[in-house]
């Protein structure tokens, strides 16, 4: 029985790539800077001491980081026995965004340039805004700018509740984000608005990767909170991913846990499981692993590393999240069967010590574990698509156009 379990620790980069200068990210290092802060006692809020990730270390995380950066992460064990195969991978895609990283992991790098809304104020074309107001029968809109998702709620959340005007905002990513109150505006109405925005962006040729619904609750600035009912409307990958090939060619199954299905626009997904928060995502993953049959991929995105701690530049929160994940990792490893493979990886970096609030261009870890996986270094990988090609070889699908088998 062949099964693959893919765990994406969203934004968990392990050191700047060779082309990081193109992105202003030279010196970024999500793992390294978290470990450094922990070792200095600068991340003791809700946790304490050096970064403690013994299980990820045994799978080769510290070695992969050393390969990427040339140094051992502060306070971590560079001499631990390694029981998995490990690598550090460079992104071939032109961006450092979520769809690009995930699609490339599945064997389809993004070699075109996304469209972006680059102006920090009055970010969106008036023609687009007018169409949204007319089609959705809106009283107007708020925002129309670049912003952090939590900051803009404090700035405009109360006005949104009074006026019913949705909050439109973007970032350095190829995104159009819409924040609305779940109760006063309504979740269904928000989703309908996002569908309209997706249509207009596609028809208008803006080439925007995602429209993101950002529902929130609360009653005043300071206590607004985004909920777990986020919904991403992505464009479809430009070519069949290894997920699609497994389903189409082998009549296999792909189980999405978390936001995976949204990222792939449901292409190649046979089952969707929603969960919010690190523990809930982990619990849902364990349940699906226990139930998974032959020719199945269980694919989970642990979004909190990115959304809750990376973008918010919360080093202590990120460290605590990693330590929680590591404590629970043995539960997951115990479910890996004789012919199974477990792959732990990321989709980009989001260094919580870095300036700004955006992603960072970094190598990602590729940690592969299974009874038949030979432990040791798989070296520097030129593309995330090596993961997709490895899965294609493992399941016996037709080969991907990009990437090399690692096993």
From Swiss-Prot:
Entry's cofactor comment: Binds 2 manganese ions.
GO biological process, one term: 2-deoxyribose 1-phosphate catabolic process
Compartments in which it is found: Cytoplasm
UniProt: Mn(2+) 2 binding residues: 306, 311, 359
Cytoplasm is among the record's keywords: yes
Enzyme Commission number, as recorded: 5.4.2.7
Gene3D superfamilies assigned to the protein according to its UniProt record, in alphabetical order: Alkaline Phosphatase, subunit A (3.40.720.10), Phosphopentomutase (3.30.70.1250)
Catalytic activity from the UniProt record: 2-deoxy-alpha-D-ribose 1-phosphate = 2-deoxy-D-ribose 5-phosphate; alpha-D-ribose 1-phosphate = D-ribose 5-phosphate
InterPro entries, alphabetized: Alkaline_phosphatase_core_sf, DeoB, Metalloenzyme, Phosphopentomutase_DeoB_cap_sf
GO MF entries: magnesium ion binding; manganese ion binding; phosphopentomutase activity
Enzyme class, first EC level, given as a word: isomerase
Cofactor dependency: Mn(2+)
Superkingdom as given in the UniProt entry: Bacteria
Transmembrane segments: none
Pathway note: Carbohydrate degradation; 2-deoxy-D-ribose 1-phosphate degradation; D-glyceraldehyde 3-phosphate and acetaldehyde from 2-deoxy-alpha-D-ribose 1-phosphate: step 1/2
Keywords: Cytoplasm, Isomerase, Manganese, Metal-binding
Pfam families: Metalloenzyme
GO-annotated cellular components: cytosol
UniProt record similarity statement: Belongs to the phosphopentomutase family.
The protein's role, per its UniProt record: Isomerase that catalyzes the conversion of deoxy-ribose 1-phosphate (dRib-1-P) and ribose 1-phosphate (Rib-1-P) to deoxy-ribose 5-phosphate (dRib-5-P) and ribose 5-phosphate (Rib-5-P), respectively.
Annotated protein name in UniProt: Phosphopentomutase
Organism annotation: Salmonella dublin (strain CT_02021853)
Upper taxonomic lineage: Bacteria, Pseudomonadati, Pseudomonadota, Gammaproteobacteria, Enterobacterales
